[in-house]
Amino acid sequence: TGCKNRKLIWGDYDMAQYYVHNLRQGGSPAPAGYSSWLDYWEKKTGSSAGTCHRVGCYKTATDGAHVQIVNGGNEWYIVPLCHSCNTQFGSNFYVNGPLVPVNPIYSIKW
């Protein structure tokens, strides 16, 4: 059972969780028209990042982190993390979605 991604249902609200690998290579500038990768995530989802999306962390989200879904392919995604969680390069952990693809040919993972 290599898939560690799961979907929790709290009341009427579905919250997808993803087991991700935090990438070191995320230091590239945000795409044109966005002030940061966090701004990119917020504009693509239409939501405010709020708190860190790492499960169990409740600090303010300050970074748009580059991650890959563990056992999920080579696609890169952006997810809001606090700076402390984002600098744990190479770590695997659960995050709450949605995940926004870095390459726009892929769909947002809700």
Label the predicted regions:
Residues 67-70, 79, 94-101:
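"Short basic amphipathic alpha-helical interaction patches in structured regions
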Residues 37-62:
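Short cysteine-rich loop/turn motifs with clustered Cys
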Residues 11-46, 94-110:
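Short, intrinsically disordered terminal segments enriched in charged and Pro/Gly residues
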Residues 62, 89-94:
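Substrate-binding/catalytic groove segments of enzymes
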